């Protein structure tokens, strides 16, 4: 199979939405019957985002094969059916690490290692490998043209443009076309300078995606075409919209997919965007609203919980309700108590690391349990629910996780190296001292308890979900917790690890050690999120009847 490559760059400012634009184009091409994949090339020196602060970088998206990647890969999976893997995201740090490892082994036979050709060759190899087996590979270059960090990536795609030829490569550049209120017009000069910068390093864009808060007038598009040496039909206006799921139709209406298909001489059907039209209709026509309180640690940056936010919206689509997310700092719960949890239709506690705010999350789980409020715990959200139950129901007053209190008399949650075996002996397992790459990662099979809410949600006796954690439920306390009424509704493939818990006599109190948000999509939703939002809606209706 001959793969065609579309390289997506950005200019003027960051956060223009390259990932959304790339994913939207991929969705249109997929709707035309093409096999499409998307890659993200990140210019930072970190090997991967696994140890980066969520408040700086946003969430870490975990792929099926366990790669810790950029959150843009979440957008990719939500827009197209192709599943991402570790070949779809790599960083400058990863490239340098691999090149230096080869140099230490002597693979370069004593040559002087340089950015060109050694680093650029390594980048090209990864791009070509990532595109194998697909009709079209869209490659997003992180950062902004002009950044010193991006230069090796830009040089690499310039070389690929020459080596593969125009019939296999296309360069798409996103720029900002701002509107100046004082002048009453849009300004094209930033776009002209951005394209000039790109051309100075040898890349001539074939398509310009012009971002702005309004549609670009025809005369300004003609002006951009003239000064940037791009066909007028290839100057695409991409205005702000109230839903990112409207963007595929917006790009298609301007013929972007047809331009790509003709450039690559591809034979394929017309795009069928009916699934996306259905998503847009559901989003615009809810039959009600629910308020979900998300009790977390990183709420100052919503992107830290990007996939959770989107999964809640998807569940709203499936339940025909609008989901309003109320972000609640878990430290605020610690300081003010449950008064900040009033008026909610459901509580969700997402994943996280570190001790800060954990008692607030435990209080949130207690509030939901005692008030029959729908509760959904994800990763740490499951662990705090278990800790709360152990303390206040099972009689283990000082129960905790060894992540937060190594001296706890009831370590109901322990590090993966601290598991207790079936005879009650502490089993120490080896763990590298580095934080990066030492977690349980990727898709894992989970067996579901027959008749449980989890099994009802999945409509089956098993599921496959993605993990990202170092701590597990300590099996030493499993029997005692079960006797107190906790239901262990999900177990690992070998049935030795607890994957899900729930409460029997509660409208909807379900938690999982995994991250179901990573597999939710606007077209398909996710069973657990759908069940949670349905329970929140039912809770609201019960309150209204009182």
Curated annotation (Swiss-Prot):
Mg(2+) binds at residues 72, 140. It catalyses: UTP + L-glutamine + ATP + H2O = CTP + L-glutamate + ADP + phosphate + 2 H(+); L-glutamine + H2O = L-glutamate + NH4(+); UTP + NH4(+) + ATP = CTP + ADP + phosphate + 2 H(+). Residues 1-266 are annotated as: Amidoligase domain. GO terms for molecular function: ATP binding; CTP synthase activity; glutaminase activity; identical protein binding; metal ion binding. The keyword Transit peptide does not apply. One of its GO terms (biological process) is CTP biosynthetic process. Its EC number is 6.3.4.2. GO terms for cellular component: cytosol. The active site is at 379 (nucleophile), 515, 517. Keywords: ATP-binding, Glutamine amidotransferase, Ligase, Magnesium, Metal-binding, Nucleotide-binding, Pyrimidine biosynthesis. Pfam families: CTP_synth_N, GATase. ATP binds at residues 15-20, 72, 239-241. Pathway: Pyrimidine metabolism; CTP biosynthesis via de novo pathway; CTP from UDP: step 2/2. The keyword Ligase applies. It comes from the Bacteria. L-glutamine binds at residues 352, 380-383, 403, 470. UTP binds at residues 14, 187-192, 223. Catalyzes the ATP-dependent amination of UTP to CTP with either L-glutamine or ammonia as the source of nitrogen. Regulates intracellular CTP levels through interactions with the four ribonucleotide triphosphates. Belongs to the CTP synthase family. Homotetramer. This is CTP synthase. The gene is pyrG.
């Amino acid at each position: 199979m001959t793969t065609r490559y579309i390289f997506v760059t950005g200019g003027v400012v960051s956060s223009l939405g390259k990932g959304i634009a790339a994913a939207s184009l991929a969705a249109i091409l997929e709707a035309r019957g093409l096999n499409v994949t998307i890659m993200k090339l990140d210019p930072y020196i970190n090997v991967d985002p696994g140890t980066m602060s969520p408040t700086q970088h946003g969430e870490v998206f975990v792929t099926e094969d366990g790669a810790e990647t950029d959150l843009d890969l979440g957008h990719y999976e939500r827009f197209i059916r192709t599943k991402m893997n570790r070949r779809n995201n790599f960083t400058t740090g990863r490239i340098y690490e691999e090149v230096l490892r080869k140099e230490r082994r002597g693979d370069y036979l004593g040559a002087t290692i340089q950015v060109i050709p050694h680093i650029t060759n390594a980048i090209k190899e990864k791009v070509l490998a990532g595109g194998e087996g697909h009709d079209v590979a869209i490659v997003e270059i992180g950062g902004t043209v002009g950044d010193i960090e991006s230069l090796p990536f830009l040089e690499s795609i310039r070389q690929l443009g020459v080596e593969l030829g125009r019939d296999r490569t296309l360069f798409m550049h996103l720029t900002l076309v701002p509107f100046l209120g004082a002048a009453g017009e849009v300004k094209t000069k930033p776009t002209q300078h951005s394209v000039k910068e790109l051309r100075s390093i040898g890349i001539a864009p074939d398509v310009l995606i012009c971002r702005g808060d309004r549609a670009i007038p025809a005369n300004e598009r003609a002006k951009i075409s003239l000064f940037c040496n791009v066909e007028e039909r290839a100057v695409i206006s991409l205005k702000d919209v109230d839903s990112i799921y409207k963007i595929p139709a917006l790009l298609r209406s301007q013929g972007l997919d047809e331009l790509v298909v003709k450039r690559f001489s591809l034979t394929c059907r017309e795009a069928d965007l009916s699934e996306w039209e259905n998503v847009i209709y559901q989003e615009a026509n809810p039959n009600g609203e629910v308020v979900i309180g998300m009790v977390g640690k990183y709420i100052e940056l919503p992107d830290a919980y990007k996939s959770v936010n989107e999964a809640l919206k998807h569940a709203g689509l499936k339940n025909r309700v609008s989901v309003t997310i109320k972000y609640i700092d878990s430290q605020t719960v610690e300081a003010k108590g449950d008064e900040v949890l009033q008026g909610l239709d459901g509580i969700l506690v997402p994943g996280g690391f570190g001790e800060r705010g954990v008692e607030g999350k435990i209080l949130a789980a207690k509030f939901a349990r005692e008030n029959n409020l729908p509760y959904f715990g994800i990763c740490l959200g499951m662990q705090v629910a278990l800790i709360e139950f152990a303390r206040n129901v099972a009689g283990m007053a000082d129960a905790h996780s060894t992540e937060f209190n190594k001296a706890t008399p009831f370590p109901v949650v322990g590090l993966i190296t601290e598991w207790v075996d079936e005879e009650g002996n502490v089993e120490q397992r080896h763990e590298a001292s580095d934080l990066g790459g030492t977690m349980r990662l990727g898709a894992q099979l989970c067996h579901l308890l027959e008749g449980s809410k989890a099994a009802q949600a999945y409509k089956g006796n098993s599921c496959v979900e993605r993990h990202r954690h170092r701590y597990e439920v300590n099996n030493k306390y499993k029997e005692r917790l079960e006797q107190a009424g906790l239901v262990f509704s999900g177990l690992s493939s070998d049935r030795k690890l607890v994957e899900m818990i729930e409460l029997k006599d509660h409208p909807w109190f379900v938690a999982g050690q995994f991250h179901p948000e990573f597999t939710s999509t606007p077209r398909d939703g996710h069973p657990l999120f759908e069940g949670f939002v349905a329970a929140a809606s039912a809770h609201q209706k019960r309150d209204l009847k009182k």
